[in-house]
Amino acid sequence: QENGYQTAIIGKWHLGTTPTGFDYSKVLINWGGQGTYFNPQFCINGKDTVTEIKRHCTQVIEDDCIDWLVNRDTTKPFMLMYQFKAPHRDWRPDSIYHDLFSDFDFPEPETFNDDYFGRLAASENMMEIENHLNRRDMKLIAPTGLSRRDSMRWLAYGDKGQFWTPYDSLNGVALKKWKYQKYIKDYLRCIRGVDRGVGRVLDYLEENGLAENTLVVYTSDQGFYLGEHGWFDKRWMYEESFKMPFLIKCPDLIKAGTVSKELVMNIDFGPTLLDFAGIKVPQNIQGKSFKNIFSDSSYIGRDAVYYHYYEFPIWHKVQPHYGMKTSKYKLIHFYYSMDEWELYDLETDPNEVNNIYNKVPGSLILSLKEQLKSLQSEYKD
């Protein structure tokens, strides 16, 4: 904004503060900032005025972003943060996608029936598709005649591992498989709506001669479990939630189809965007630009990335843990109500089911721990 860009954020914010640095902001505010899939509420430009629009949340955000692009000041460069609620829990797709994927079943992931052997923290989880998806997640309808409070309790049944089934004849393995299909199909139906919204913006850029000179980034705040390890949700340092999508399009500077396996962190996103815009990166910003990762074959990225999760026990009983990933290894320490270390060789065990912490030379453990301590010192954690 200080460098002449017209700036806007539309959609999910979820930080508990009013956005600053934007010429225009319209962010979700109900359900703790997550927003709801239907009848979402927004705060516009930090004012008390709340707008409720009776359409699907993805469609509202999509339409508002197109409107902003059409009506912006075209004499200025722009920066737009276009942020969807979908596919956050409880995965309620737009009605136009209700029948999508209804004619086939998705294959279950390789680790769908993981027994968590050798991984104490994982074995204590409360995010299993089999045991912890509730009635609301599966789109069941509460019985009539219940109070609002009792209706909410009825829908939440299953969160704590309580057994329930939609049909008396559906149980055991068949019930687990049924829950998975309902979950994955609703998740991907929500994603289809996001795909539509992203496509509309890309089409707008093409139709208005902006595609060649606009940097487009598609990313997320984390990955997600789609049945891997038998789970839904996120939080763990295991690959499926630890890794984030990061696709970038800038025809003038990046050759289509370029793929990099260099390690980067989300704190690098800001400096990278500033670098692409030709803006000096402030000294007090953590992270570093990886702009040259796409154009310089000699670019050397990070040799390790750091992670720390500390919320417990409210969210799915995921133990607080910190750790480090290199190109070959991942070292994790669960430290709150247990003292457990895990080490994975990502080259031979990409699914992270074989904890080798007690099976490798002590010299390797010592070296990795020293590297981990160095990262903690760097980030003052």
Regions found by a protein language model. Name each.
Residues Q1-H14, E52-K54, T58-I61, D67-W68:
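Long, well-ordered early-domain segments
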Residues Q1-I9, P19-T20, Y24-N45, S377:
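Active-site segment of extracytoplasmic enzymes that catalyze sulfate/phosphate-ester chemistry
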Residues Q1-Y5, V70-T74, D203-E206, L274-G278, ...:
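Sec-exported extracytoplasmic/periplasmic mature domains
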Residues N3-A8, F22-D23, D73-L80, L210-V216, ...:
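Loop/turn elements at helix/coil->beta-strand transitions in domains of secreted/extracellular proteins
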Residues I9, T18, C57, I61, ...:
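Stable alpha-helical elements in mature extracytoplasmic
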Residues G21-Y24, I29-G33, V50, D90, ...:
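C-terminal cap/loop subdomain of S1 sulfatases and analogous C-terminal strand-loop tails that border
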Residues N30-I53, V70-T75, M81-V264, F276-N284, ...:
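Active-site-proximal cap/lid insertion segments
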Residues D349:
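Intrinsically disordered, low-complexity polar regions and short flexible loop motifs
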